[in-house]
Amino acid sequence: MIFVSHFIYHEEKTAKAMVEGVDLLESILGKELFLKEVEVIKTDRGSEFSDAEGLEKDNDGSMRTHVFYCDPMASCQKGSLENNHKEIRYICPKETNLKVLGFDSQKKANLMVSHINSQPKENLKGKSPLEMMEFLNPALYKRFMEFGIKKIENDEIILKPYLLKEDN
């Protein structure tokens, strides 16, 4: 429903940064909610995801999730994640310097996620992912709101690169 693949801002694309991102997500959600909602992480075989053990286990060594690597060129294995990537590309076109676009902080990541997930979807019968989350999982919705995700009114949704240039 709502995606978290680009929910956490990373300064660099390293295995250490990805583990720190999962650690942050766990701290945002809390252990119990994280274990319930992040049972699986599906990813490609990029070097930034090479520390499967660091992603799967928390700081005390307990299993917290399972990492599954998709086959190369098999976007069908990633489900709706590929659709989310298309929406991200409206705001952050491929081969564009993200810093030049203004994508330089967690605040900007939250802004992008807020706009993408406030947009009504046909496959959700005209509801947005955030509306569905609020209805189906109020605890998860509350944690995301506390972290800085917010609902954007339909007439204010922007899925263009200039979104990140604005002072939001």
Each PLM stretch: what is its role?
Residues 1, 13, 22-25, 89-90, ...:
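Metal-centered catalytic cores of metalloenzymes
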Residues 3, 22, 41-44, 78, ...:
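Mobile genetic element proteins and their domesticated derivatives, centered on retroelements
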Residues 4-8, 70:
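Polytopic alpha-helical membrane proteins, predominantly small-molecule transporters/carriers
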Residues 7-32:
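Active-site beta-loop-alpha junctions of metal-dependent nucleic acid enzymes
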Residues 32-51, 71-73:
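Acidic/histidine-rich, metal-coordinating catalytic segments
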Residues 36-37, 63-65:
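Loop/turn elements at helix/coil->beta-strand transitions in domains of secreted/extracellular proteins
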Residues 53-55:
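Short amphipathic alpha-helical segments
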Residues 57-58, 64-153, 159, 163-167:
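Charged alpha-helix within mobile-element recombinases
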